[in-house]
A protein has these predicted regions:
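Negatively charged, low-complexity tracts enriched in Asp/Glu with abundant Ser/Thr
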Residues: 1-51
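Compositionally biased, low-structure terminal segments
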Residues: 4, 21, 59-61, 70, ...
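Alpha-helical structural elements
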Residues: 7-8, 15, 32, 36, ...
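Intrinsically disordered, low-complexity segments enriched in small/polar residues
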Residues: 18, 39-42, 55-56, 67, ...
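Acidic, low-complexity, intrinsically disordered interaction modules
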Residues: 44-96
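Mixed-charge, Lys/Arg-enriched low-complexity segments
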Residues: 77-131
Length: 131
């Protein structure tokens, strides 16, 4: 009998409790000039209605605002990380972007895409480049 792996409870509860807006992990890249990440955003924590003046969200978050979660997978040239003070979503190449409503949907997506859910962490522990 085999059990499907899930996101570690400590990490998931941190996302649900608003300790962080996203959890992420770095993935292996087939291209040595690129780094690759996957992140799960708790979109329902974001305030799309009453923002501070000038505050904006990444386009993938704006597009997902009617969903509870969004998963984004993207690559980023290593050269950008080495030469720029900040990184934006326009610097990335999005390879997957999918909205979801439940933890079960997320776990199924991760399983189908051979992504180990136990490796998700808060963004600062995996050098996640998007703020």
């Amino acid at each position: 009998m085999s059990f499907q792996k899930t996101i570690l409870r400590k990490t998931w509860w941190g996302l649900e409790a608003k300790s962080y807006t996203e959890i992420a992990q770095e993935l292996p890249s087939q291209d040595e000039s690129l780094r690759k990440w996957i992140a799960i955003y708790a979109v329902y924590h974001l305030n799309f209605e009453n923002r501070h003046p000038g505050e904006s969200y990444y386009k993938f978050l704006e597009n997902a605002k009617n969903s509870k979660y969004v998963i984004i997978e993207f690559t980023l040239p290593i050269h950008f990380l080495e030469t720029r003070d900040s990184i934006g979503a326009n610097d990335t190449t999005i390879t997957k972007c999918k909205t979801m409503e439940t933890e079960e949907e997320i776990n199924s997506f991760l399983y189908e895409n051979n992504i180990n859910p136990e490796l998700f962490t808060p963004p600062w522990t995996c050098e996640y480049p998007l703020d």
